[in-house]
Amino acid sequence: MEEFQGHRELYRSWQHNFFYPLIFQEYIYTFAYDRGLNKLILLENVVDQRYSLLTVKRLITRLYHQNHLILSVNDSNQNEIFGHKPKKNLYSQMITEGFAVIVEIPFSLLLISSLDGKEKKIGKSTNLQSIHSIFPFLEDKFLYLNYVLDILIPYPTHLEILVQTLRYWLKDASSLHLLRFFLYECRNWTSRITSKESISFLKKRNRRLFLFLYNFYVCEYEYFFVSLRNQSSYLRSTSFGALLERIHFYGKFKYLVKVKDFAVILWFFKEPFPHYVRYQGKALLASKGTSLLMHKWKYYFIYFWQCYFSVWSQPRRIYINQLSNYSLDFMGFLSNVRFNSSVIRSQMLENSFLLENIRKKFDTIVPISPLVGSLAKAKFCNVLGHPIGKSVWTDLSDSDIIDRFGRICRNLSHYYSGSSRKKNLYRIKYILRLSCARTLSRKHKSTVRAFLKRLGSEFLEEFFTEEEKVLSLILPRDSSTSGGLYRGRVWYLDIICIHNLVNDQ
């Protein structure tokens, strides 16, 4: 009955666009700290033992008193719970986590209402949730395009921009004021969050709230951009024997005009439809148009961010590149359009001809340098790529050590399965294999050679090639490959995030 009452109150608040009272409800904090919804935050902060129901009740009691809404982080008396001193910002952290759940409510309800009656249609497109679905799209479209804009989406230069972007959707003024309080409450924050240190601190402070605000900011920008892209499929042009210049960005004319008694037809040029993909803060805009058109798109983005979001984006954050001469560094892959030429001999009666056939191919390559840097940062090798033992794992059992190394290899193999050239991936797996052997030999106070000689070289080889053997059983083999392992390209439809070693910056 209490759960039903809570849902009814939630619905009434949604009807009136009024979410501020929900901050006083206990079930909001239950949602915020449920391990299924907020597992990453619990694992990082390791403070779940102190977020008990009694702590939540004490927090809500203090919230009812205006004097305790703003909690001093330096007052040790206010911050004592159950006789010990927790983190300085325990209560403030709890409020921000609960508020992050509250601001997601209207958008979750809008999503549910938009999906009502469309279960069958949505069910067919669930595979599009995988980030690997981007690469088949790039393979199909980028082969026929000329230029690409490599865009780094700028962060808002002021915290108030995030609030102003949200206020068009969230009509509750009290909630907006509370959001401002959370954003400016931290002493370590400045009025600008453009530096990498400030962004990192904001993520650690409240990852869920930060991701919501940033994703909403990006979605607002993309909403306007998609509208522009749909309207710019046709551009109005004037011509007098030659194309002079586009004078409007929207609309088109479908009639004739008289210029000096000569009938001049207004030419209609269909704009090369641009293709847009984005992951996190990096986006790609590719088109079949000319270099002049791409420069117009570039400066449109700069002026658009400046005018609509008060965000200054430097021109060097947007690069114009020709696809035939450029490798895209996107989502952990190096991708490029490669030309494959083949010579075909054609015989016609007594004459023979040599025909050169040029075919485009979209290549996805595993970048070796960033991955070696990530492995060196994680202490699996040095900066030159020479494997070293993971000393902090020597206290674990042999099976746990092998399982951890094997899990990393499986994740990397799983993510880079669509690479057209896997030589670099095998180098990374070789580094991890020797690092595992060095870790085990260090634990048993032996040398790597003696350890492998005692257990056999197949001890680790079979384990680290497990996924390739599974693929070779369910997919056709390439007779030219050795060992019977599968060397083809596979894109998985169950990958929703990039592995930490892939996404390390």
UniProtKB/Swiss-Prot annotation:
Q: Which UniProt keywords apply?
A: Chloroplast, mRNA processing, Plastid, RNA-binding, tRNA processing
Where does this protein come from, organism-wise?
Answer: Froelichia floridana
Location relative to the cell: Plastid, Chloroplast
Stored InterPro entries: Domain_X (IPR024937), Maturase_MatK (IPR002866), Maturase_MatK_N (IPR024942)
Tell me, in one coarse class, where this protein mainly resides.
plastid
One GO MF term: RNA binding
Q: What does this protein do?
A: Usually encoded in the trnK tRNA gene intron. Probably assists in splicing its own and other chloroplast group II introns.
Give an example GO cellular component term for this record: chloroplast
Does the UniProt entry include the keyword Acyltransferase? no
Q: Name one Pfam family in it.
A: Intron_maturas2
BP GO terms, sorted = mRNA processing; RNA splicing; tRNA processing
Task: Provide the family line.
Answer: Belongs to the intron maturase 2 family. MatK subfamily.
Protein name, per record:
Maturase K
Ranges that cross the membrane: none
